[in-house]
C-alpha cells in the first residue's frame, strides 16, 4: 500500500539521499516512513552517477576525516551490506588513490593536513 504521508521525504536519490534513506531504514529506533524523490528512476543520470565517481580522501578537520573514513568503509563493505539474499551488489568500486598537489607556499599546510589524516 502506498502511503499518502511520510515521516521523512528525501529530495534526491544520489549518494547522499540514498545514504540517508538506507541509514534511517537500518536504524532500529526509527519506525517511520521514508520517501525518496528522484527525478531519474533509473538513477543513471542522478548527480552521483554523473560525478565521475571521484571520492575525496583528504580533509583537514577531524569531523570530515571521520565521515570520509566511514564512507570508505561503507563502499568497501557495500557488496555484503547491501546484498539481497545471495546476490551481492557490485558498485564497481576500485581504490586508485588520490593525488593532491601544492606549491611551496601551501606545502606546509598540505603536509599538516596529510599528517592529521594519517593519525
Predicted segments with their positions:
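Local beta-strand N-terminus motif with an aromatic residue
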Residues: 6-7, 32-33, 83-86
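Flexible, glycine-rich phosphate/dinucleotide-binding loops
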Residues: 17, 43, 108
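Dinucleotide-binding Rossmann-like beta1-alpha1 core, especially the glycine-rich loop
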Residues: 52-119
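Glycine-rich FAD pyrophosphate-binding loop
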Residues: 25-48
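Short beta-strand/turn micro-motifs composed of small residues
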Residues: 12, 38, 102
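Beta1/beta-strand and adjacent pyrophosphate-binding region of the FAD-binding site
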Residues: 2-16, 35
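Short, flexible hinge/linker loops that cap or flank conserved catalytic cores
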Residues: 2-3, 28, 93
Amino acid at each position: 500500500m502506498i502511503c499518502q504521508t511520510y515521516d521523512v521525504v528525501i529530495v534526491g536519490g544520489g549518494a547522499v539521499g540514498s545514504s540517508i534513506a538506507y541509514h534511517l531504514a537500518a536504524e532500529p529506533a526509527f519506525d517511520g516512513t521514508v520517501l525518496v524523490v528522484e527525478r531519474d528512476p533509473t538513477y543513471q543520470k542522478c548527480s552521483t552517477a554523473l560525478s565521475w565517481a571521484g571520492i575525496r580522501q583528504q580533509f583537514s578537520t577531524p569531523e570530515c576525516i571521520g565521515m570520509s573514513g566511514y564512507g570508505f568503509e561503507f563502499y568497501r563493505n557495500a557488496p555484503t551490506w547491501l546484498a539481497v539474499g545471495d546476490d551481492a551488489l557490485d558498485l564497481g568500486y576500485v581504490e586508485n588513490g588520490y593525488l593532491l598537489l601544492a606549491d611551496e607556499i601551501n606545502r606546509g599546510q598540505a603536509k599538516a593536513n596529510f599528517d592529521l589524516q594519517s593519525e
